[in-house]
Every structure is written in structure tokens, then in C-alpha cells.
Amino acid sequence: MNLHPKLERFLMTSCDQFFSAFPQKRPAKKLLEDCLIISHRGIHDQREIKENTMDAFVLAEEKGVYGIELDFRWTRDLVPVVVHDPDLERVFGMDTQTAEHDFESLKGLCPSVPSLHQVVERF
């Protein structure tokens, strides 16, 4: 299902706000000690280090996380690239759709967007 990008962002934000209003109880210490940390889109602050970039994944690796979770979208020439949203607006401030670009033009526009192949090869 493809949602309009603005509707998708609205729904994601609404869901985040809903669940943040109902915090969960802190797990028992033993459960926390035994858990494996999976980094959601790497470790990022959205200012210096953007989500789903090699920098975010390298930082997660350096911090010793067990694994990383990532998202991917297809470029016009069917190269899977590691980007969460269908557009680059929220993360990179660019009003353009990932699927409108071939991989080379996307890399020229936004060099920090890696291909799925690059991420799998590195990690």
C-alpha cells in the first residue's frame, strides 16, 4: 500500500505521540542485562548523523549494538537504497521522491544515502 507522503508522516507522528503518552513500566534489571540491543535505523541525532546512513550504522557498531534495523526503497533503476520515507524531505530537507531518481542521480543529490548492497557488504 502506498500512502501519500504527507499522510504517511502524519500517521507515523500520530502513532509516536499516542504511544509516548502511555509509557511502559521499566523492565526488571535481569531482563535488561540479558537483552540484545537492535539499533533502529542506526544511532542518529538527525542533525550531525542522519538515520539509515553509513555514519549511523558505524556509530551503532562502535557502541556495541547486537544488530541494526534499516529500511529500503527502490530507485527508478531498481537499485535498493537505504531510506525510510518515500521522499527525502523529513530527513534531508529535499522535496523529491526516491523513486524519481536513478541511483547515480540520487547519490549526486544526496551522497549519504547508501545502497542496500553497500550496507550489507560493510556490516
What would you call each of these model-derived segments?
Residues 1-123:
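Phosphate-group recognition and catalysis centered on beta-loop-alpha active-site segments
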